[in-house]
Design a protein with these regions (language model features):
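Internal active-site segments that recognize and position negatively charged phosphoryl groups
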Residues: 133
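N-terminal, charged/glycine-rich beta-strand/loop interface patches
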Residues: 2-122, 127
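Short, structured patches in soluble enzyme cores that scaffold and shape functional sites
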Residues: 78-80, 88-90, 110-112, 120-122, ...
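Structural motif
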Residues: 83-85, 115-117, 144-146, 208-209, ...
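N-terminal intrinsically disordered, cationic/polar leader segments
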Residues: 2, 11-20, 24-40, 103, ...
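A short, polar/proline- and glycine-enriched secondary-structure boundary/capping micro-motif
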Residues: 43-47, 95-100, 128-130, 156-160, ...
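A structural signal for small-residue-enriched, beta-sheet-centric alpha/beta enzyme cores
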Residues: 151-276
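Short, surface-exposed charged micro-motifs
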Residues: 75, 107, 136, 170, ...
Length: 276
């Protein structure tokens, strides 16, 4: 019996996707260039032609999605005065899990005078998907950051909703070596019922977050001026030198439109893939 269990476990592990990307960028003569790059497994990053002084990177998951037991690790370092924008080639899909949760670990380090925009396309969680994600962000006090994430609970365009599963999202932000923001979102079990609660999303199928560093009340007021155009619910606040906008909407397209309206008030440049 033990041998059969061990064999089954080994087969499951062997069939799980693994992927890792690690690279750094640096600025020279006002132009951002890529340094050392490491890629392994089914995760890749491609760099389109540079636009101005900044560098853009596009992540590609050749596994075609995320399933239970998969693991992906991303580690990025942006040196002083560099400018980097990161996105994904398509929406990421997390499929039904029959075993342990998929694990996604993202580590970002941004130096003095540098800027990093993390703007992937949405993550779509299928019913009974299991995903555990972690962001560890280390900013110099003089660095700037725009981090945007959209999560959709089910393929809403197909009339599907995520009813059961697991989604755990850890965010840790350090600035100047000090922890200034820590949050863990945990949804598991009967996710459909939890999302229906007024204190959660009031039935909305898509949620989003935009973390803006630096950010202050003046930025919050500029964003609030656009509130009449929002298709969903948007909340914005600022503290500890950064601002955070939270979104919920009935589908990804409405939420993305609201997020783009907010980002327009920050002066952020959107990745071309967001405009397709």
């Amino acid at each position: 019996m033990r041998s059969d269990v061990s064999t089954t476990s080994g087969i499951f592990e062997a069939n799980r996707a693994r992927g890792a990307v690690r690279f750094d960028v640096h600025a020279r003569d006002g132009v951002t260039r890529r340094g050392a790059l490491h890629e392994s497994g089914s995760l890749r990053v491609r760099f389109p032609s540079p636009e101005g002084e900044g560098l853009s990177g596009v992540f590609v998951n050749t596994a075609g999605g995320v399933a239970g037991g998969d693991r992906f690790d991303i580690e990025i370092s942006a040196a002083d005065r560099s400018r980097l924008t990161l996105t994904t080639a398509a929406a990421e899909k997390a499929y039904r899990a029959t075993g342990p949760a998929a694990r996604l670990n993202i580590t970002l380090k941004v130096g003095a005078g540098a800027h990093l925009s993390w703007m992937p396309q949405e993550t779509i969680l299928f019913d009974r998907a299991r995903v555990q994600r972690r962001f560890d962000i280390d900013l110099d006090e003089a660095a700037s950051l725009l981090l945007c994430e959209i999560v959709v609970f089910g393929r809403t365009a197909m009339g599907e909703r995520m009813e059961q599963g697991e989604f755990v999202d850890h965010w840790r932000l350090r600035r100047g070596g000090k922890l200034v923001f820590a949050e863990t979102v945990r949804l598991d079990g009967n996710i459909g019922a939890k999302l229906a609660r007024s204190a959660v999303t009031k039935g909305a199928a898509a949620i989003g977050t935009a973390l803006i560093v630096p950010g202050d009340e003046a930025l919050v007021e500029r964003i609030r001026e656009a509130s009449d155009s929002f298709a969903g619910e948007v909340g914005i606040s600022a503290w500890n030198g950064f601002a955070m906008a939270r979104f919920c909407a009935q589908d990804a397209s409405r939420l993305r439109a609201d997020m783009m309206a907010v980002l327009a008030r920050t002066g952020a440049a959107l990745p071309r893939l967001w405009l397709n």
